[in-house]
Amino acid sequence: MMNDNKYIHIDSCVIEKHKIWDSLITKFGSHDLILQSAYIDSLIIWIPKERIIPIMEFLKQILAPHVMLYDLHGIDERLRMYRKELPEADFTVFYHIMSMSRNYDVILKVPLLENAMNVTTITSVFMNANWYERETWEMFGIHFDYHPNLTRIIMPKCWKGFPLRKEYPARATEFYPAFTLTRKKEDLAMDDLLFKPEEWGMHRNNKHEDFMFLNLGPNHPSVHGVFRIILQLSGEEIIDCVPDIGYHHRGAEKMGERQSWHSYIPYTDRVEYLGGCINEMPYVLAVEKLAGIVVPDRAKIIRIMLSELFRINSHLLYVSTYLQDVGVMTPVFLAFTDRQKIYDVIESITGARMHPAWFRIGGVADDLPLNWSDLLKQCLDWLPKRIAFYIDIALKNSIFKKRTCGIGSYGAKEALSWGVTGSGLRATGIEFDLRKSRPYSGYENFDFDIPIGNGLSDCYNRLVLKIEEMYQSIRILNQCLKNMPTGPVKSDHPLTTPPMKKYALKHIETLITHFLQVSWGPVIPPNESLQMVEATKGINSYYLISDGNTMSYRTRIRTPSFPHLQQIPSVIRGSLIPDLIAYLGSIDFVMSDVDR
């Protein structure tokens, strides 16, 4: 059961860091490149904005290139106290690029002053920078020169201000004058929803015909949430389309700046509301890095067990609703019965079903109940035969194959260009799953396989991989069942929150600590951390900045569904509307994960 993947990855990180740094200073010199250290297993370099394109192009072309833009966002540095040895900056643009072949990442930071809030767009280097730059512009006011369409993407067009700037209110009650949605404002917002093709570089007609523009959503059942796609049609053929997101935006990152480190945990469950505890994992791991907390083995395995239960639960919903979208009705009724059995296990452990908020900074909320193993065993005995049934009625169904094989397809190069992760990427033949490639929370101690495709990610292969992943999760859960370690479920570190109550009842100092950490929150040492995990829909991560306070200075949530929806137009052009329905069902997304 044991292996050394984690330690191999750590050693390789050190080697790759020196290799990349040496190649960069050989090419560009070192006089204006500044290294930064943080609790992040990546090379972090501050660079002047004039160098962003040359350095990006260089890293994309070197041996074992960095071919995926994983994330791009901004930071308001103006109120940050602990900036020792960092370049002068009022704002920072943060670029995270990945290399699957190196299994190592580079983070580039560009400092900006308030009187020069602009940087050149990198859409010429990475296609998926488009949406990220639009989001960064509307949240911080950072202008990306030469961007093809620098408009609002998440907030309404009529919205004023830049919500992630520090002076912007974090609560509705802090607005002055108070925010009210008057009838006039509502009418203006509705007018903004009127689609004007010219704003998107589209033509209303050509020499031979007038095109039809069709709103699919935001209330259509096949768009899986409040999501609108405007289709440019020639008959039933999709000439082009524009995904319109933001209807589910709740300001999850802004909330991270107003909640204590501990009280933010319930919010993580609701970012991707089907993933449950998987959403808590990257957040608590990132905080634990900042705090220097080592989690007990029993807590690690409990976290993995709950995460894999939620993974199967999410995959069952994906499989059943996807099949329903293309006309196979039976599985959706059966899958909800299966999901209830999993929820029964989760509820017996955590007391909740969909959103347990069960992980804690330093461990988990409580130990396992006495009968946990019996309930889990019954569930694991039941699931394999039900999954086999779904294979029979779906994967072997000739009509389903006709609807999905070769539909919504793309290869490895396109997947990497658009920032695709999860089963969509692995279906192209790229074996990259963070549980194996960069193991966390004890995954290096488990024996399981990573299902990969045959080189083409299409609607059929993505479903095949999801089903195979459920079998692998069952393997992991069986190992949890047989090898659950004994010991505490929470660290005795002073910053563990909330501290162990048994100590608070014995000593006045620990009682005071318990009171302060529960009411105000723990004071986390200043630094930065990043934790990526293999979530249900792809790679999810939290990038946290602590300024030595009880709350996060910056909480960046990178979700997999955001880039997956940006890819839709490139995949579906030239297809028919029924193909789009199949493609949307095969992506596996929920809008809370997209909009945050």
UniProtKB/Swiss-Prot annotation:
Q: Which GO terms describe its molecular function?
A: NAD binding; NADH dehydrogenase (ubiquinone) activity; NADH:ubiquinone reductase (non-electrogenic) activity; quinone binding
Answer whether the UniProt record assigns the keyword Membrane to this protein: yes
Subcellular location, in the record's words? Cell inner membrane
> Which residues form each disulfide bond in the chain?
none
Q: Which residues form the signal peptide?
A: none
- Could you confirm whether the keyword ATP-binding appears in this record? no
In residue numbers, the region (NADH dehydrogenase I subunit D) covers 210-596
Entry-linked SUPFAM superfamilies? HydB/Nqo4-like, Nqo5-like
- Cellular component, GO annotation: NADH dehydrogenase complex; plasma membrane
Report keywords, A-Z. Answer: Cell inner membrane, Cell membrane, Membrane, Multifunctional enzyme, NAD, Quinone, Translocase, Transport, Ubiquinone
Q: What is the reaction catalyzed?
A: a quinone + NADH + 5 H(+)(in) = a quinol + NAD(+) + 4 H(+)(out)
| Record InterPro entries | NADH_DH_suC, NADH_DH_suCD, NADH_Q_OxRdtase_suD, NADH_quin_OxRdtase_su_C/D-like, NADH_UbQ_OxRdtase_30kDa_su, NADH_UbQ_OxRdtase_49kDa_CS, NDH1_su_D/H, NiFe-Hase_large
**Region annotated NADH dehydrogenase I subunit C, chain positions:** 1-186
Q: How does it sit in the membrane?
A: Peripheral membrane protein
User: Where would you find the membrane-spanning parts of this chain?
Assistant: none
Q: What is its EC number?
A: 7.1.1.-
Q: How does it assemble?
A: NDH-1 is composed of 13 different subunits. Subunits NuoB, CD, E, F, and G constitute the peripheral sector of the complex.
UniProt cross-references to HAMAP family, sorted A to Z: NDH1_NuoCD_1, NDH1_NuoD
Family listed: In the N-terminal section; belongs to the complex I 30 kDa subunit family.
Q: Summarize the protein's role.
A: NDH-1 shuttles electrons from NADH, via FMN and iron-sulfur (Fe-S) centers, to quinones in the respiratory chain. The immediate electron acceptor for the enzyme in this species is believed to be ubiquinone. Couples the redox reaction to proton translocation (for every two electrons transferred, four hydrogen ions are translocated across the cytoplasmic membrane), and thus conserves the redox energy in a proton gradient.
What is the protein name for this chain?
NADH-quinone oxidoreductase subunit C/D
Question: In which organism is this protein found?
Answer: Blochmanniella floridana
Q: Which gene encodes it?
A: nuoC
